[in-house]
Amino acid sequence: MFQEYLSVIVKGIPTSLLLTVVSLLIAFFLALFLTFLLSMENKWIKSAVNLYLTLFTGTPLLVQFFLIYAGPGQFQWIIDSPLWYVLSNAWFCAALALALNSAAYSTQLFHGAVKAIPKGQWESCGALGLNRIQTLKILIPYALKRALPSYSNEIILVFKGTALASTITIMDIMGYARQLYGTEYDALTIYGIAGGIYLIITGIATLLLRKLEKKVLAFERFEVSKA
């Protein structure tokens, strides 16, 4: 029975991984844009971004899934518009929910890294005659390198968050596990297999991300040894 269950549940791995990659790509670029806006000296823009961050970091991801998937269908004008073509697609809604949620947390990470940039680097850019936008274009990539260890954890959280996609009919790892449980009622074995798959994938991803961190943050070790 174990092998039969495993052969069914592993069918959801490609969907879970694809959801993770697509969501992270959207979230990363959105977070970069929002970090840029937060670093500008405009209180209205900063207030709007902070409202978005509060909404998506202050509410459960599961609630966001249901609001994005079921919410638009409450408005006839959305149903009659071209938007309904994508908003009625469960896969798109799952990717959107994950992306918006991850972008909020990633923005906090990136903006924190920007604020942690030594004052001397800001002053150096100012001494070169660079304006605020030009300075941010130079310093944000540096800040992203410093934020990588924390962002690695966000990548893992997004992958594990894909398990919620099964609640809106997506056949990912948990989707196949839930379907299998509906016919076999062997919760311990079925969900144990699903949990094991998540554990193995997150373990591999963690090892790869740690190696990436060592390469990307090598400049810090060089600076320390040089000092």
UniProtKB/Swiss-Prot annotation:
One cellular component term from this protein's GO annotations in UniProt: plasma membrane
Membrane topology: Multi-pass membrane protein
Main localization (coarse): membrane
Pfam short name (any one): BPD_transp_1
Record GO terms (molecular function): transmembrane transporter activity
PROSITE patterns: ABC_TM1
Keyword flag Transit peptide: no
Subunit note: The complex is composed of two ATP-binding proteins (ArtP), two transmembrane proteins (ArtM and ArtQ) and a solute-binding protein (ArtI).
NCBIfam families from the UniProt entry: HEQRo_perm_3TM, PRK11122.1
Function summary: Part of the ABC transporter complex ArtPIQM involved in arginine transport. Probably responsible for the translocation of the substrate across the membrane.
Protein name: Arginine ABC transporter permease protein ArtM
Organism listed in the record: Haemophilus influenzae (strain ATCC 51907 / DSM 11121 / KW20 / Rd)
